[in-house]
Design a protein with these regions (language model features):
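Glycine-rich phosphate/diphosphate-binding loop of Rossmann-like nucleotide-binding domains
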Residues: 105-223
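N-terminal ligand-binding/catalytic initiation module
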Residues: 1-107, 346-354
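Rossmann-fold NAD(P) dinucleotide-binding segment
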Residues: 211-224, 234-251
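Short, surface-exposed connector motifs at secondary-structure boundaries
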Residues: 60-63, 132-135, 222-225, 244-251, ...
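Flexible, glycine/charged-enriched surface loops at secondary-structure junctions
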Residues: 23, 60-69, 92-94, 129-137, ...
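Adenosine-phosphate binding glycine-rich loop
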Residues: 124-125, 243-356
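General beta-strand structural signal in soluble alpha/beta enzymes
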Residues: 64-68, 92-96, 140, 163-166, ...
Length: 356
């Protein structure tokens, strides 16, 4: 409900450079609505999606603009939007990504952003610190698609994830977040409060938003090796950054778009904490969207292993591109500057070659 034109323009600008870092032939745009799905029935959400597409369809196309899901928009909503698009245009093409697999979606699209975040983190830690995620304690914020799949992949790599959060509060589970419980609370449109986790899992602690540390977020006030902000913009403050540093955190890897406040980034970098901006580390989602577009265009279906392999390779390439650019411009290990310079150069060079 807080979406406005200013936010969308800013995110569209960022999307251009995120897409640029992938090296894939995609531009960048953003769209959205201030419709709040909380408390709405499936039928009400479907009605809205259909009405939205009736206004949107003339501005999008497989070779024009291909919208994808984001906050509040998952496979269900994409399905409603795509169904209305087909009814209006009678076209079956790759005009939306993140579609259900049954009619044109790609395997791994729901997992792509979260998995990509972890693949980027693993590559960065391996190259910069000769470390792995196995056996490491990690903090994650959020309980949406990106956060849940970030937690899932971290656990698959042997990490112990001890936090997750929603708009009402944060769960800390020292034995490791039980994804089955979180999905029971948040899955299939349930969207129940994470407070229910504490009643189901003995030993876990729930902190309501009203009880958060002054100027901070409870998810970042526990000891961890790496932190993964995966919820929303400006969720990790300077206060949080100071606490992470105090607790021995060595890396912060953004899963959400711009979740870390600028003064927090400055502090983390000054203290030697590896920091990856979202335009680099969360590019996995848009990458697999492009994979989906490629499959739609060629009328193919890739198997899971192929998509996963290509995603891992692409995230490693993004890390390498960002890291080498940072070194080239005298700002080694500054992945913010490295990402911005690498992305801007590719866009600028393309514009010059096209005579823009």
């Amino acid at each position: 409900p807080s979406v406005d034109t200013g936010i969308l323009k800013f995110l569209a600008f960022e999307q251009i450079f995120k897409n640029s870092l992938t090296g894939l032939p995609i531009g960048g745009a953003k769209g959205g609505s201030d419709f709040d799905p909380k408390g709405k029935s499936d039928f009400e959400i479907m009605k809205f999606c259909r009405a939205f597409m009736r206004e949107l369809y003339q501005y999008i196309g497989a070779r024009v603009d291909v919208p994808a899901g984001d906050i509040g928009v998952g496979a269900r909503e994409i399905g409603y939007l795509y169904g209305e698009y087909k009814r209006i245009t009678r076209n079956y093409d790759g005009v939306l990504s993140g579609k259900p697999y049954e009619f044109g979606g790609s395997l791994m699209r729901p997992q792509a952003t979260g998995y990509g975040v972890v693949y980027f983190a693993a590559e960065m830690l391996s190259q910069e610190l000769q470390e792995t995620l196995e056996g490491k304690t990690c903090c994650v914020s959020g309980a949406g698609n990106v956060a849940l799949h970030t937690i899932e992949k971290l656990q698959q790599m042997g990490a112990l994830v001890v936090t997750c959060s929603d708009s009402e509060g944060t769960i800390y589970d020292p034995r490791g977040i039980d994804l089955c419980v979180v999905r029971e609370l948040k899955g299939n449109g349930a969207r129940a409060s994470l407070e229910g986790y504490a009643t189901r899992v003995p030993g876990s602690v729930y902190t309501a938003k009203a009880d958060y540390p002054a100027g901070g977020h409870a998810a970042w006030h526990y000891p961890c090796f790496a932190a993964f902000p995966c919820a929303t913009q400006n969720e990790l403050s300077r206060t949080d950054a100071a606490k992470l540093i105090e607790n021995g955190c060595v890396a912060v890897v953004e899963g959400a778009n711009m979740p870390t406040e600028p003064d927090a980034i400055e502090l983390l970098q000054r203290e030697g904490v590896l920091f990856s901006p979202g335009k680099a580390s969360n590019a996995g989602g848009v990458a697999v969207s492009e994979f989906e577009m490629s499959q739609n265009a060629s009328m193919e279906k890739w198997d899971y292993d192929k998509v996963d392999r290509k995603l891992q390779e692409l995230m490693a390439q993004i890390y390498k591109r960002v890291s080498l650019t940072a070194k080239e411009y005298g700002c080694e290990r500054n992945f913010v500057d490295g990402a911005n310079i690498a992305a801007f150069k590719r866009v600028a060079e393309a514009m010059i070659l096209e005579g823009v």
